[in-house]
């Protein structure tokens, strides 16, 4: 199979990218090898790939001989290709390969996360952040995530306060994880080429949140604050309390600041001070 281009294999099974599924395929194994290398895969690692598509990244992962790989793929057209790939590797590596046909957003993840995993995936553009927030609910069962998004989404994930990209996603992700932007991926690497650039991020879950607070309340506060990000906090946070000035005073945060000015510690003080 190494002599067969993944693109030819996809053609064999009539697989082409569907816009409705947010698909953009990579056929360059040099690139997917580079992506997989950032997961630092050992033969003791259990991996999950979400949305394998035409299988280039799957192939690169399997070449690293992990202990197991669970592939979750919604597109029925891709299943036969994955089964052929599984057969190809069956006498070459010791990896236990499990193929699950289904929508990741509808699967019972408690059954999936029976052990700790590394996650590596080229996420569908249209539901990438939704998948990320779902994964964060199981952060204690995840050792590492290497994820591909639109470049703008990557920038929002790793953004720091006082920047235009800083928002709810940066706060929620970085409360639970350490994040790092790895590299740009040009649109020309995809078939079809999307209208935007992509990027790769490394997300390493912490053993526990960086601050011990009510995360559901943090989610609510960040949603309200960043939905009106140009407003000062004394105005944007009014819907959450009867006395916003007293709340901000208890949290030791100036009312004329905006959500984008706050650090993670500031948000933690807001959560603790609302009571």
What would you call each of these model-derived segments?
Residues 1-224, 265-272:
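Catalytic cores of RNA-modifying enzymes
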Residues 205, 222-275:
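C-terminal lobe and adjacent flexible extensions of AdoMet/dcAdoMet transferase-like proteins
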């Amino acid at each position: 199979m190494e002599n067969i281009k993944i693109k030819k294999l996809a053609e064999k099974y009539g697989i082409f990218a569907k816009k409705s599924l947010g698909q953009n395929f990579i056929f360059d194994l040099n690139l997917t090898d580079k992506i997989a290398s950032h997961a630092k895969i050992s033969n003791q690692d259990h991996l999950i790939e979400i949305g394998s598509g035409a299988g280039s990244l799957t192939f690169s992962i399997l070449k690293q001989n992990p202990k197991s790989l669970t592939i979750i793929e919604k597109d029925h057209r891709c299943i036969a290709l994955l089964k052929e790939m599984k057969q190809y590797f069956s006498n070459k590596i010791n990896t236990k390969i499990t193929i699950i046909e289904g929508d990741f957003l509808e699967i019972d993840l408690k059954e999936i996360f029976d052990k700790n995993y590394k996650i590596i995936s080229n996420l569908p553009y249209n539901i990438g952040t939704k998948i990320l927030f779902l994964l964060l609910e199981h952060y204690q069962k995840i050792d590492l995530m290497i994820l591909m998004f639109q470049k703008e989404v990557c920038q929002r994930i790793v953004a720091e306060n006082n920047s235009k990209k800083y928002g709810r996603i940066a706060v929620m992700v970085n409360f639970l994880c350490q994040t790092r932007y790895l590299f740009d991926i040009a649109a020309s690497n995809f078939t079809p080429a999307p209208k935007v650039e992509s990027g790769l991020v490394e997300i390493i879950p912490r053993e526990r949140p960086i601050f011990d607070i009510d995360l559901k309340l943090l989610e609510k506060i960040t949603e309200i604050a960043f939905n009106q990000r140009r407003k000062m906090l004394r105005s944007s946070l009014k819907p959450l309390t009867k006395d916003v000035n007293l709340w901000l005073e208890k949290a030791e945060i100036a009312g004329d600041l905006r959500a984008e000015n706050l650090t993670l510690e500031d948000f933690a003080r807001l959560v603790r001070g609302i009571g």
